[in-house]
A protein has these predicted regions:
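N-terminal intrinsically disordered, cationic/polar leader segments
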Residues: 1-195
């Protein structure tokens, strides 16, 4: 199915040297949903930590280097230093009555076999979110070995098909957000939407 969205990566410990002085900054990387590869978080952690002894004259050079290293032939992710991460309260996230919030979502990392935990937010303009089905469906991921992005895409596609089959109007609006907890200094937050 066609969808829109992005994967928001927050790297909480990004070390480098700025004119010989050690720096430890936070970096945010926004990968478009159609980025041709899924980067494994352990690889990203090792890559980020490889900067600990690289010296730059200006901070902008760090961002330029990251963009150069991470771009593909067609796409370059948005990358920026940030001073603090936006952490919206539940009241900011849940401002619609048609939002289903599922805490304690669990899947298994296919590389390390470690659990990945998240809060999943599902929004639909229709009132046809079957909460009992959603609860059972999201619980079914508890032993599933898959990447964050793949889990959210599977959740999005399954719910979208369910909404389309239960609605006379085949144009339905759906958003699925996975706010995964940090592991190894990185959290990954996939977001998928019909538009």
């Amino acid at each position: 199915s066609q969808f829109y969205g992005y994967d928001l990566w927050n790297i909480y410990e990004f070390p480098f040297l700025l004119r010989g002085t050690p720096q430890l900054r936070m970096i945010q990387i926004k990968f478009p949903q159609d980025f041709p590869v899924i980067i494994e978080s352990k690889s990203m952690k090792l890559y980020a930590n490889s900067f600990y002894n690289k010296d730059f004259k200006k901070q902008d050079q760090v961002i330029q280097r990251l963009k150069s290293d991470l771009k593909t032939k067609m796409l370059t992710p948005d990358i920026s230093f940030i001073n603090k991460f936006e952490n919206p309260s539940d009241n900011q996230i849940i401002n619609h009555e048609n939002i289903f919030k599922f805490e304690g979502f669990r899947s298994i990392c296919p590389v390390t076999s470690q659990p990945d935990w998240a809060t999943i937010y599902i929004y639909s303009k229709t009132n046809s979110l079957d909460r009992k089905f959603l609860n059972k469906f999201l619980l079914s991921f508890r032993e599933q070995g898959d990447f964050h992005e793949s889990c959210i895409i599977q959740i999005f596609n399954t719910i979208l098909e369910s909404l389309k089959s239960s609605s006379l109007n085949k144009k339905t609006h759906l958003e699925v957000v996975g706010k995964f907890l940090r592991r190894g200094g990185i959290d990954i937050n996939p977001i998928r939407s019909t538009h």
